C-alpha cells in the first residue's frame, strides 16, 4: 500500500458506497488547502443481478482510479439498520469500494458517517443541505451532480483533515 506522506500535495478519492449509486469525489490536499479535482457516481442499472451490479461498481471505480490517479482513498463505513438484507447488500458494495483502490496499491481509510459530518460541518448529525453548504465553502469549484457525489467529497475532505494524525501514528508505531 502507498505510504501516507506528511508533506506535499496528495490526491485523495472519497467513496460513498451504494448499490444504486456509488458516489466518488477526488480532491487534492496540501496542508489546509483543498482543491477540487472531480466527482461523480457509478450507477449500475437496477435490473442487473447483484453480482453484475457489483462488477459495474468495480469497473466504474477502476476507471475513475485510472483516470484521476489518487494516492489515498477513504470509504464511508456502513451503519446497520433494521433491514439486515439491505445492510448485507450495502456491505458488499462497500467491499467493492474498498477492493478497487486496494487493487491499485492505494491505502484505504474508513470513516463513520457521523465523523464525516462532524469534520465537514462541525455537527455529527448534520443533514445533506448543511453538507452541501459547507462543500460550496470548502470546494467552491465543485458542483456535485448527486448527494452521493457530495457525500464522497465530504469523505475525501474528512480524510484530508485526519490523515496527518494517521500518518504520525503510523510513523510512531514504525509502519
Swiss-Prot record:
Gene3D superfamilies membership: Ribonuclease H-like superfamily/Ribonuclease H
Keyword annotations from UniProtKB, A to Z? Cytoplasm, DNA damage, DNA recombination, DNA repair, DNA-binding, Endonuclease, Hydrolase, Magnesium, Metal-binding, Nuclease
Which cellular component terms (GO) are annotated to the entry?
cytoplasm; Holliday junction resolvase complex
- Which coenzymes or cofactors are required? Mg(2+)
Record-annotated active site: 16, 76, 148
What InterPro entries does the entry give? RNaseH-like_sf, RNaseH_sf, X-over_junc_endoDNase_Mg_BS, X-over_junc_endoDNase_RuvC
Question: Tell me, what is an example of a GO biological process annotation in this record?
Answer: DNA recombination
Any idea which positions bind Mg(2+) 2?
Answer: 76
A single Gene Ontology MF term assigned here is:
magnesium ion binding
In this chain, Mg(2+) 1 is annotated as bound at 16, 148
Q: What is its main location?
A: cytoplasm
Which top class of enzyme applies to this chain?
hydrolase
Q: How is the cofactor bound?
A: Binds 2 Mg(2+) ion per subunit.
Q: Report the locations given in the UniProt record.
A: Cytoplasm
Task: From the UniProt record, list the reaction(s) this protein catalyses.
Answer: Endonucleolytic cleavage at a junction such as a reciprocal single-stranded crossover between two homologous DNA duplexes (Holliday junction)
Look up the EC number in the record and give it.
Answer: 3.1.21.10
In its keyword annotation, does this UniProt entry include Hydrolase? Answer: yes
Q: How does it assemble?
A: Homodimer which binds Holliday junction (HJ) DNA. The HJ becomes 2-fold symmetrical on binding to RuvC with unstacked arms; it has a different conformation from HJ DNA in complex with RuvA. In the full resolvosome a probable DNA-RuvA(4)-RuvB(12)-RuvC(2) complex forms which resolves the HJ.
**What does this protein do, in the record's words?**
The RuvA-RuvB-RuvC complex processes Holliday junction (HJ) DNA during genetic recombination and DNA repair. Endonuclease that resolves HJ intermediates. Cleaves cruciform DNA by making single-stranded nicks across the HJ at symmetrical positions within the homologous arms, yielding a 5'-phosphate and a 3'-hydroxyl group; requires a central core of homology in the junction. The consensus cleavage sequence is 5'-(A/T)TT(C/G)-3'. Cleavage occurs on the 3'-side of the TT dinucleotide at the point of strand exchange.
The UniProt family comment states: Belongs to the RuvC family.
Query: This chain belongs to which protein, by name?
Result: Crossover junction endodeoxyribonuclease RuvC
Which organism does this sequence originate in?
Bradyrhizobium diazoefficiens (strain JCM 10833 / BCRC 13528 / IAM 13628 / NBRC 14792 / USDA 110)
Gene of this entry? ruvC
Amino acid at each position: 500500500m502507498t505510504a501516507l506522506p506528511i508533506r506535499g500535495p496528495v490526491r485523495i478519492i472519497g467513496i460513498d458506497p451504494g448499490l444504486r449509486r456509488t458516489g466518488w469525489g477526488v480532491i487534492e490536499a496540501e496542508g489546509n488547502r483543498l482543491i477540487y479535482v472531480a466527482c461523480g457516481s457509478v450507477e449500475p442499472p437496477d435490473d442487473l443481478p447483484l453480482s453484475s451490479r457489483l462488477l459495474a461498481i468495480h469497473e466504474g471505480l477502476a476507471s475513475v482510479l485510472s483516470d484521476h490517479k489518487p494516492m489515498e482513498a477513504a470509504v464511508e463505513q456502513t451503519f446497520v439498520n433494521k433491514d439486515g438484507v439491505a445492510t448485507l447488500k450495502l456491505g458488499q458494495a462497500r467491499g467493492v469500494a474498498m477492493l478497487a483502490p486496494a487493487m491499485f496499491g492505494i491505502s484505504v481509510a474508513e470513516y463513520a458517517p457521523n465523523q464525516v459530518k462532524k469534520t465537514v460541518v462541525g455537527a455529527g448529525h448534520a443533514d445533506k443541505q448543511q453538507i452541501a453548504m459547507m462543500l460550496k465553502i470548502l470546494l467552491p469549484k465543485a458542483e456535485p451532480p448527486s448527494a452521493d457525489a457530495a457525500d464522497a467529497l465530504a469523505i475525501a475532505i474528512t480524510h484530508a483533515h485526519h490523515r496527518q494524525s494517521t500518518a504520525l501514528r503510523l510513523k510512531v508505531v514504525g509502519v
